[in-house]
Amino acid sequence: MSNYKVTVLGAGLAGCEAALWLAGKGVQVELYEQKPAHFSPAHKSEGFAELICSNSLKAERLDSASGLLKEEMRRMGSQLLNAAEVARVAAGGALAVDRDTFSAEVTRMVEAEPNITVHRERVEHIDESAPILVATGPLTDGALADEIGRLTGDERLHFYDAVAPIVTAESLDYEKVFAASRYDRGEADYLNCPFNKAEYEAFHAALASAERAPLHEFDAGAEQGAQPDPDAHGKKADTVTVYEGCMPIEIMAARGADTMRFGPLRPVGLIDPRTGHRPWANVQLRAENKERTLYNIVGFQTNLKWGEQKRVFSMIPGLENAEFVRYGVMHRNTFLDAPRVLSAGLCLKEHPNVFFAGQITGFEGYMESAACGLLAARNIYARLEGKELPAPPIDTMCGALIQYLTTENRHFQPMGANMGILPPLPEDQRPRDKRLRYMAVAERAVASFQQWLEENNF
């Protein structure tokens, strides 16, 4: 047992993973959880690490992004992966769990740990006098959200997540897609997907009639500055909100055949090199990372079901065989403007004793949140020991996620594990087969991650 003491706010995936790791190092952890005194609109049980959406923790294969992330987590000593084994249910090549069993096992592990003291109460003030980890999740609200806003600047804390889909660069059809800026001004920073009239009309019809995902109650409530959607496909207009600054592309399509052509799909200032003429409409793709291995579909914030996104957005010229690494979502989501306020050590740049972990940082997904908890815990422990922990190498999944989180990005949005954020292999070492290529990338990542662990073993 050490004399170190750390406060952790939130007993979700990130908070529990961090608390268990720190406790294993002999740190006295004060873990605060607001349930059962206060429940968010999404949470129903009193247990820790409650899974509120899917019960899948995604693929286990090493040559998949989620499988690679799990391998890195195992090497860091993940306790939640042990709990997942206890709660495992059959799911083919994926790791899926009985959510009640999983939560019960994590709760048992936390409550059985002598170095963790659980406080079932809501915290509204952040005490910076000692290291504190905020892992309160994407539904953080009330006085604590105000406190975070005070520390980060209110404009650096987002309360609504409107995300466009992201595709891999290597899956695009460059016979159709071309690089250009409007009127050839400046660098050709965007890729362009030009429509002719027939292609656009077919795309518009498919988009306007596509099936939308149901909104959770906590996503659908009216927010300041929101307007009711008058065409909500059967949903009550007073329960569905449309944000003019991030309007779903399908609602724009429903407003008229030409609405998109005078909005995000406007073709002005562009020439299709195949025809020598201005396209009827044009979709732009913007690089999501410096390596330009990922592109987001500009202006395509959406609430379509994921299968519908794949079907409809694959009608965009050049995206017929696109690999989607993230589908668009629109939901209530409290997260930091991480590139501006968060260091690579997952603490605030201006308040270094205040650490963050989980989805509130911009790590998107169950296992990503847990991995973020492990990384934050290691950084906190290094700080207690008077050391600074370097971020994992960028050719590892954890390192690539940290780099994404902390690299300047005017359009920052949460990101989950995907192979597209990892640096590509050198051309002479790149297998043509995608499965073999991903395996080679994963093996490189594991070796690099293991070396990082050995060099920073404290």
Predicted regions and their residues:
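Dinucleotide-binding Rossmann-like beta1-alpha1 core, especially the glycine-rich loop
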Residues: 50-60, 85-101, 105
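Beta1/beta-strand and adjacent pyrophosphate-binding region of the FAD-binding site
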Residues: 2-14
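Helical element adjacent to the flavin cofactor pocket in flavoenzyme catalytic cores
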Residues: 99-118
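Predominantly flavin-linked oxidoreductase catalytic cores and closely associated redox partners
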Residues: 112-286, 291, 295-306, 310-311
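Internal hydrophobic alpha-helix adjacent to the cofactor/substrate pocket in enzyme cavities
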Residues: 369-391
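A glycine-rich dinucleotide-binding beta-alpha-beta segment and adjacent secondary-structure elements
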Residues: 297-363, 370-372, 390-407, 412-418, ...
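C-terminal auxiliary extensions adjacent to catalytic cores
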Residues: 415-458
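N-terminal FAD cofactor-binding segment of flavoenzymes
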Residues: 20-82, 394-402
